[in-house]
Amino acid sequence: MTELYWRAATDAGSYDGTALISVGQGAVHLRTDLPAGTLENAVATLSWPMAENEKIFMNGYQTWTECPELPKWGRQRGTDHIPKFLLDKYAFDRYGDYHFVRYSKRKGMSHGFSYCYFRSGEHYRLVASLDETPGYTIFYYDAKAAVLRIERDCAGVCHGGSAFAAFDLFFAEGSEDEVFDAWFAALGCRPRTTKKLAGYSSWYNRYQNIDEASMLEDLQGCRALFKPGDLFQIDDGWEAKVGDWLETDPAKFPHGLRPLADAAHESGFLAGLWLAPFVCEKESLLCKNHPDWLLQVDGQPWCCGSNWSSFYALDIDNP
C-alpha cells in the first residue's frame, strides 16, 4: 500500500485529501465538494519506485506524438534541440503538446496522457484514467524522486459549485492482457463484433501524387487482390486545397470523383475518401473567406504545422 495525496482548488477554496492505494487496486474515485469559481488545479502524487531494469511507457498526446518505452533514466525530447529558424520555418513545435506541457531536460523525467505503464519483463503495472470528461489526465514521472504526479487539465474552467470529480483512476498489475483487459472492462469497452475492414489507400503508395488516371490504374490492380466489400480509398491529394472539401483539384480530377466512386462500386468495393475536417490550409478559400472560423490565440490564427501551405485549426467551439 502507498499513500496518495491529492488536492483540488478553485479561486474560492480548496480541498486536500489522502487515499491508500495498492498497485492492483482497480478503480479509485477522488471527488470532493468545491466552492463555485474558476478551477485552479487538481493534483495527486504518490510514491512509485521503479526497478533499474524496468521500462516506462507514457501515452502520447496524439497520434503524431513519439512515445516509445523508455528505460528508467531515459529522457523525453522536446523541441529545445531544434534550431529556432527551423522551428519558425516548419512549425515543429505545433505538432504536439510543447506549448502547454512542460518538458524537463533531466534524465528520468517523462510525461503522458490518459494512461501509463511500468514493465518488468512480462509484468505490467498500469495507471490509467477512467474519465477524461473533466479534462485530460496528465501523468508525470520523476525517477530520481520515485514519484508519480497526476494532474487534471482543468485550470481556467468554471466550476458551478458542489461535487467535483478530481480523478477517476484505475490501478492494475499482471500480464499485458490482464491489465489492459481489466481497464477496458472498467471503462465498459467491449470487443467489437463487426468484421475487420481491409482494402487499399492511395496514401501509402502515391502520397499526394494522385490523379484520375493513376487511381483507375490502382483500382484495376485492386480487382485482382481484394474481395467484394473491401475498401478502395482515395487519400490526400484529390482536393483543390485542404479545407475546400467541395472542390476537387481540376487538373488532377477534371471529372470530379463520381466516376471513380462509381467504378469502385462496380468493382464490388466500398468507396472511401480522406478528409481532415478540423483544419484548413493557408491558401484555401475557407481560410481567406472565413477567418473568423479559425482558432485564435492572442488574437491571431493558430498555425498547427507546415503541411501543405501551412494549416490552421478551426474553432469548433465557435457556433
How would you describe each model-predicted region?
Residues 1-182:
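N-terminal accessory beta-strand-rich subdomains and adjacent acidic, glycine-rich linkers
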Residues 10, 34-36, 50, 154, ...:
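Short, flexible loop/turn elements at secondary-structure junctions
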Residues 32, 161, 200, 232, ...:
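Conserved, mostly hydrophobic/aromatic
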Residues 179-228, 236-240:
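An acidic-aromatic substrate-binding cleft motif
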Residues 195-196, 227-231, 266-272:
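Loop/turn elements at helix/coil->beta-strand transitions in domains of secreted/extracellular proteins
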Residues 197-213, 240-255, 305-319:
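The substrate-binding groove and active-site-proximal loops of carbohydrate-active enzymes
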Residues 204, 273-319:
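Active-site-adjacent "subsite" loops/lids of carbohydrate-active enzymes
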Residues 235-290:
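Acidic/aromatic-lined carbohydrate-recognition and catalytic surfaces
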